[in-house]
C-alpha cells in the first residue's frame, strides 16, 4: 500500500470507530491481537451512542464522501444483505456535494469541443451550476445553432483517481468481511463491490448515458405517459452530455401538483404502466427512478405526463426472465406457491436439485401472512424481496438484473402511493401481465414466431442439401479420425505398459547387481554384468515413454 492509501485507510477506520460501527463485529471474532491493535492504533470512543446503528452507519458513509455515499445507496437496494432498519437508513443517503468551480467546467467543455471557446457553440452559458452531485454537475445554456435551451452535464475533473483509490480500499475491507462476520461468506462482499464498481464506472461514461436516453426516448416517442428530453448527440462525449432543458413539477411536490389540477389517480396509475411497459414491452428500463429524477409536465394536468431524466443506470431482462417474472407475479397473487417454486427451479435461479416441496413450504411460510392485508396495500417490491430472500436460503444466485428491477419497483410504488394512497398496483398491473403472457404463448405467438423465422429459412432452403451432404461427409471423416485416435491410444497404452515393465526389470537388475557387488565380492564380474544389463533395460524402457 502507498503512504496515501495507508492514511486514507486509517481515516476510514477511525471514522467507522467514532460512530461505533465495530458493534457490527461479534466480540468472539475480535482476537486478542486485533483488540490490542484496535485500542493502540485506533483508540476512538463511540461519539454517537444516542443514535441507532443504522443512522450511525449512514452518517459515517456521508462523512467519508461521494464514493461511499453512492456505495451506501447501492447497498440500500440490497435488502437481502441488511435488516430493514439499516436498509431504510441507507436509502436516506443524499448524493449532494458542493459544486466545483464553474471555470473548470467551462474548461472541460472547451476541451471536449476541440479547444474552441464555449461561445462558439453556446449562448447564455451560466457559470453557476444548476445542480451538483458526486459524479457530475449541470450548467445551463442555449445552442448557438437553433437557440434551444439545453443543460450541459460535465463529469467532475480528476474524479476517476479518487474513485479508483477508494474502490481499492473498499475491496480490501470486503475481503475482511468473511473473517469478521459470522454470515460474511454468504453476503459475498467482493461480488457486491464488483457490482458497485461496474455501476459507478458506467456512470462516468456520459456517452453511455446519452445512448440510454436516446433509446428510452425512442421507446416512448409520442407517448402520453412519459417524455424523455432530446439528447444532442453531436455535442456529447465521454465527459460531457448536452440535452434539452425541461421545466416540470418535481414528482415529490404533491402540493404543487394538486395546485396545478393534476389528475393524481391517473398519474399514479401511469407510473405503474410506464414501469411494466419498459420491462415487458421494451426489455429496457430506467433503473434509477427515484423522485429526484422524475418530473411532471405543467401542460394538460388532466392528462398528466411524466418527464424522466438521468438515464445513467438502466436494466434489461431477457425473454425467459420476463416470462418467469410475469408468471411468478400471477402465481403469487393466485397463492399458487407450488407454481412459484417450480418457476424458480425451471428458470435456473435456484439449483436444479432443489427440493421443490421444501421450497414451496418456505415460500408459503414467508408470503402467506402478506395476504392478511387488502390487495391494494400489498407491495410488489416487498413481494419480490420476500421471494428473493427465501430463495437465497436455497442457494439462489444473485441476479443483478432482478435486483435492479426490485429497486426500481420500490421507487415506483413509493412515488405512486405518495401521489395517490389508494393506488391498487395489482389491479393496475394484472391485466397488463395477463395480456403479455397471453401474447407470448399459444397459437398466435407460435404463428408470429414462424413468420419472423420464415425469411431466414426460405433463404437457407437451397443450402440445406449441401449442408446435409457436408455433415454426412464430415461425420464419415470424424469416424475415421475417432478410429485413428482410438488405435493410437491403444498403441500408446501397450507401449506404456511395456515401458513400465522394462523400467521395473531394469531397476530390479540394477538394485540386485548393486546388492551383490557390496555383499558378494567373490561372485566376480556377475554383479557388474547385472548392473550394466539393468541400465540397458531401464534405458530401453525410458525411450518407450518418449
Curated annotation (Swiss-Prot):
It is an enzyme of class 2 (transferase). Keywords: ATP-binding, Cell inner membrane, Cell membrane, Kinase, Membrane, Nucleotide-binding, Transferase, Transmembrane, Transmembrane helix, Ubiquinone biosynthesis. It is found in: Cell inner membrane. The chain crosses the membrane at residues 501-521, 522-542. The active site is at 288 (proton acceptor). Residues 124-502 form the Protein kinase domain. It is a multi-pass membrane protein. Is probably a protein kinase regulator of UbiI activity which is involved in aerobic coenzyme Q (ubiquinone) biosynthesis. NCBIfam families: PRK04750.1, UbiB. This is Probable protein kinase UbiB. It comes from Salmonella enteritidis PT4 (strain P125109). The gene is ubiB.
Amino acid at each position: 500500500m502507498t503512504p496515501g492509501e495507508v492514511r486514507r485507510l486509517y481515516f476510514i477506520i477511525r471514522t467507522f470507530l467514532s460512530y461505533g460501527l465495530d458493534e457490527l463485529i461479534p466480540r468472539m471474532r475480535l482476537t486478542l491481537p486485533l483488540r490490542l491493535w484496535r485500542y493502540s492504533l485506533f483508540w476512538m470512543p463511540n461519539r454517537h451512542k444516542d443514535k441507532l446503528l443504522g443512522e450511525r452507519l449512514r452518517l459515517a458513509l456521508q462523512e467519508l464522501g461521494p464514493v461511499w455515499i453512492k456505495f451506501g445507496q447501492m447497498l440500500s437496494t440490497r435488502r437481502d444483505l441488511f435488516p430493514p432498519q439499516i436498509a431504510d437508513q441507507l436509502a436516506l443517503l443524499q448524493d449532494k456535494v458542493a459544486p466545483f468551480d464553474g471555470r473548470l467546467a467551462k474548461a472541460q467543455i472547451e476541451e471536449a469541443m476541440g479547444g474552441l471557446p464555449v461561445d462558439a457553440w453556446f449562448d447564455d452559458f451560466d457559470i453557476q451550476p444548476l445542480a451538483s452531485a458526486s459524479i457530475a454537475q449541470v450548467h445551463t445554456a442555449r445552442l448557438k445553432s437553433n437557440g434551444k435551451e439545453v443543460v450541459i452535464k460535465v463529469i467532475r475533473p480528476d474524479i476517476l483517481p479518487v474513485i479508483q483509490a477508494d474502490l481499492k480500499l473498499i475491496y480490501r475491507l470486503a475481503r475482511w468481511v468473511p473473517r469478521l462476520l459470522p454470515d460474511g461468506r454468504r453476503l459475498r462482499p467482493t461480488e457486491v463491490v464488483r457490482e458497485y464498481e461496474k455501476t459507478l464506472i458506467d456512470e462516468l461514461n456520459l456517452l453511455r448515458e446519452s445512448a440510454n436516453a436516446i433509446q428510452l426516448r425512442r421507446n416512448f416517442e409520442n407517448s402520453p405517459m412519459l417524455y424523455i428530453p432530446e439528447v444532442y448527440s453531436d455535442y456529447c462525449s465521454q465527459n460531457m452530455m448536452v440535452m434539452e432543458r425541461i421545466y416540470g413539477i418535481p414528482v415529490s411536490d404533491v402540493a404543487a401538483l394538486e395546485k396545478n389540477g393534476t389528475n393524481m389517480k391517473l398519474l399514479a396509475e401511469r407510473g405503474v404502466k410506464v414501469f411494466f411497459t419498459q420491462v415487458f414491452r421494451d426489455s429496457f428500463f430506467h433503473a434509477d427512478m427515484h423522485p429526484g429524477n422524475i418530473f411532471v409536465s405543467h401542460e394538460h394536468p388532466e392528462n398528466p405526463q411524466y418527464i424522466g431524466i438521468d438515464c445513467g443506470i438502466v436494466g434489461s431482462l431477457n425473454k425467459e426472465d420476463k416470462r418467469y417474472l410475469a408468471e411468478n407475479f400471477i402465481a403469487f397473487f393466485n397463492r399458487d406457491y407450488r407454481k412459484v417454486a417450480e418457476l424458480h427451479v425451471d428458470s435456473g435461479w435456484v439449483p436444479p436439485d432443489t427440493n421443490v416441496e421444501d421450497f414451496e413450504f418456505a415460500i408459503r411460510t414467508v408470503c402467506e401472512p402478506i395476504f392478511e392485508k387488502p390487495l391494494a396495500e400489498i407491495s410488489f417490491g416487498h413481494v419480490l424481496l420476500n421471494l428473493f430472500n427465501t430463495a437465497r436460503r436455497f442457494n439462489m444466485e444473485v441476479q443483478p438484473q432482478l435486483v435492479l428491477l426490485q429497486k426500481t419497483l420500490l421507487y415506483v410504488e413509493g412515488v405512486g402511493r405518495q401521489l395517490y394512497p389508494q393506488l391498487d398496483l395489482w389491479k393496475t398491473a394484472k391485466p397488463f401481465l395477463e395480456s403479455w403472457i397471453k401474447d407470448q404463448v399459444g397459437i398466435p405467438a407460435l404463428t408470429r414466431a414462424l413468420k419472423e423465422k420464415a425469411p431466414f429459412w426460405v433463404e437457407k432452403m437451397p443450402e440445406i442439401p449441401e449442408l446435409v451432404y457436408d455433415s454426412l461427409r464430415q461425420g464419415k471423416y470424424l469416424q475415421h479420425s475417432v478410429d485413428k485416435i482410438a488405435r493410437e491410444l491403444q498403441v500408446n497404452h501397450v507401449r506404456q505398459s511395456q515401458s513400465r515393465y522394462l523400467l521395473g526389470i531394469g531397476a530390479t537388475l540394477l538394485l540386485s547387481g548393486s546388492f551383490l557387488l557390496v555383499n558378494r565380492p567373490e561372485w566376480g564380474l556377475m554383479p557388474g554384468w547385472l548392473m550394466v544389463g539393468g541400465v540397458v533395460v531401464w534405458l530401453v524402457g525410458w525411450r518407450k515413454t518418449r
